[in-house]
Regions:
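N-terminal Rossmann-like FAD-binding beta1-loop-alpha1 element of flavoenzymes
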Residues: 4-42
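N-terminal FAD cofactor-binding segment of flavoenzymes
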Residues: 21, 39-95
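Predominantly flavin-linked oxidoreductase catalytic cores and closely associated redox partners
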Residues: 128-281
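FAD/FMN-dependent oxidoreductases across multiple families
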Residues: 252-365, 369-372
């Protein structure tokens, strides 16, 4: 492997983690980020920094004990700055609820922080690295190959030479289609487990601020509150500075009319508040006496998740995927941040070793680091009794009273 600069495509969590770790191992690295927006200069803007390339950033993100451990061990300055900005650490145990899938919900020290705050800190840390350059508004448009391996990345009509690049373009990035265009066949990916695979979902999210520190309700899921109510789920995810996020997840094609037509009113502030207030596990959190909303309702539709693997990265030598580009898990499992951090750090470690002359299978090392995290939920979603989707639809339609107390 030559000593030219490494390229990272995408400045999200996985991309910047990879880039920071590469730079700190002495590898010069350029990050190509299609979004032109740069991080706000002041700390006050951290909580409201939303990038077009991360439409899901408004959702509640769980930074599990494994995520926290990675930060403490490998990026302690990032963790320190997050805590200075109001992120919270707290000890959690396994979920008390029943989980019908894999049973390894995590225990340990977790981190409560909003995704925009995390993104802001990570970008600021990256921009201070002497060997790292973030190019905002530089959209990669294709790949160039020579002799059967990567030789460069296209940015418009220009070619940026590279013998190694990291695909951190996310779950629905363009790299796979670029490889199709170059004639590199797709490799078979693992068949989804019908018991755990997602069919896609609609997400409705709103952020609240508590009037005082603490939790007004039980965190019955360890890292969150709420649960799975059959045709939908609803969770409270604690965050920094006494804020929290409430998120409804409505699976695509859900039975009993739980689809868009009946629950679409969740996208309105009044409908969202009424629905959240009708769920006993959530009601205490959104009680106006305890908290007030600080954002509108964000609606987002995600297609079915894609189960990746090491074989999916073997299409073109010199190109390795990290984060969601490597493996897109069901958002309900809350393992995305851990996979992004672990795969990025493993990639940097393997690339650095290869540049030092070791014989390293970079793709295999990256997948090994992510595989265990991708296979199990960080936060189980307990099956709970509560309003059905039909009950929720009636609340949204205004035909049922909102329970009080």
């Amino acid at each position: 492997m030559s000593s030219s600069r490494a390229l990272v495509l995408g400045a999200g969590v996985a991309g910047l983690t990879t880039a920071i770790a590469l730079a700190r191992r002495g590898v010069p690295v350029d990050v190509l980020e299609r979004d032109a927006a740069t991080a706000p200069s002041g700390r006050r803007g951290a909580g409201s920094w939303y990038r077009d390339g991360a439409p899901h950033a408004g959702q509640g993100h769980v930074f599990s004990p494994k995520s926290h451990q990675v930060l403490a061990d490998e990026l302690p300055d990032v963790l320190r700055q997050l805590l200075e900005l109001g992120a919270r650490e707290w000890s959690v145990g396994p979920s008390a609820g029943r989980w019908d899938g894999p049973t390894s919900a995590e225990s340990g020290t977790a981190l409560a922080v909003r995704r925009p705050v995390f993104d802001w800190v990570l970008r600021r840390v990256a921009e201070r690295e002497p060997l790292l350059r973030v190019h905002s508004g530089a959209a990669a448009t294709g790949l160039q190959t020579s002799g059967g391996r990567l030789s460069g990345v296209l940015v418009g009509r220009a070619v940026v030479p590279a013998d190694f690049a990291v695909d951190a373009t996310g779950a629905f990035g363009p790299v796979s289609s670029w490889l199709d265009d170059l004639g590199h066949p797709r490799l078979a990916e693992p068949r989804p487990d019908p018991d755990t695979a997602s069919t896609g979902a609609d997400f409705y999210t709103r952020c609240y601020a508590l009037h005082w520190p603490g939790e007004p309700g039980e965190l019955n899921l360890g890292l969150a509150a709420g649960g799975d109510f059959g045709d939908y789920s609803c969770r409270v995810v604690p965050a920094d500075n006494n804020t929290f996020t409430v998120m409804f997840t409505v699976p695509a094609g859900a039975p009993n009319g739980a689809g868009e037509s009946r629950l679409a009113p969740l996208s309105s502030p009044d409908g969202f508040q009424a629905a959240a207030s009708s769920i006993p596990a959530i009601a205490d959190w959104v009680d106006p006496a305890a908290a007030e909303p600080i954002t509108g309702v964000t609606s987002l539709r995600l297609p079915p998740v894609r189960r990746g693997g090491a074989s999916a990265m073997a299409r073109l030598p010199g190109l390795v995927a990290v984060g969601d580009a490597l493996h897109t898990g069901d958002p309900v499992w809350c393992s995305g941040m851990a996979v992004a951090l672990a795969s990025g750090l493993a990639c940097a470690s393997a690339v650095s070793a290869a540049r030092d002359g070791e014989t390293v299978d970079v793709a295999a090392r990256v997948w090994d680091a992510a595989a265990d995290l991708a296979a199990y939920p960080a936060c189980a979603c307990a099956r709970m009794s509560g309003p059905s989707a039909g009950d929720l639809a009636e609340v949204l339609a205004g035909s049922a009273p909102v329970p009080v107390g």
